[in-house]
């Protein structure tokens, strides 16, 4: 099982969201920033506009699993923060994966 290197500190999330670039679609906003570490780190956030904690946790799990399954498609040396815009609990994991891959393509980050 591939394990993701996850952003843990609030300042790391803030740095990526403030200084980084973003691309978005209907369900997800992806922020990304070069981290000069030679490895990818991932962060996942869900808005409290999604009222139920169960639904927020499901959205977070969907995002995390989609990133884990496509880890090799992410360029090295970047921090990524994925934010769920709206309730994603009706989506399947494959739909979330497709959405994330489209965002990666739109971001035009060169894979090293």
From Swiss-Prot:
The keyword Glycosyltransferase does not apply. Coiled coil: none annotated. Its EC number is 3.1.26.5. It catalyses: Endonucleolytic cleavage of RNA, removing 5'-extranucleotides from tRNA precursor. The keyword tRNA processing applies. One of its GO terms (cellular component) is ribonuclease P complex. GO terms for molecular function: 3'-tRNA processing endoribonuclease activity; ribonuclease P activity; tRNA binding. Keywords: Endonuclease, Hydrolase, Nuclease, RNA-binding, tRNA processing. Pfam families: Ribonuclease_P. GO terms for biological process: tRNA 5'-leader removal. SUPFAM superfamilies: Ribosomal protein S5 domain 2-like (SSF54211). RNaseP catalyzes the removal of the 5'-leader sequence from pre-tRNA to produce the mature 5'-terminus. It can also cleave other RNA substrates such as 4.5S RNA. The protein component plays an auxiliary but essential role in vivo by binding to the 5'-leader sequence and broadening the substrate specificity of the ribozyme. HAMAP family: RNase_P. Belongs to the RnpA family. Consists of a catalytic RNA component (M1 or rnpB) and a protein subunit. This is Ribonuclease P protein component.
């Amino acid at each position: 099982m591939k394990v993701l290197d996850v952003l843990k500190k609030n300042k790391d999330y803030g740095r990526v969201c403030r200084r980084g670039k973003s691309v978005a679609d209907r369900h997800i906003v992806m922020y990304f920033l070069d981290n000069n570490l030679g490895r990818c780190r991932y962060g996942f956030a869900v808005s409290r506009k999604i009222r139920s904690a169960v639904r927020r946790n499901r959205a977070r799990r969907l995002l995390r699993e989609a990133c884990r399954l496509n880890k090799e498609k992410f360029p090295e040396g970047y921090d990524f923060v994925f934010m769920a815009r709206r309730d994603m609990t009706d989506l399947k994991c494959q739909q979330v994966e497709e959405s994330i891959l489209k965002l990666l393509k739109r971001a035009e980050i060169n894979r090293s």
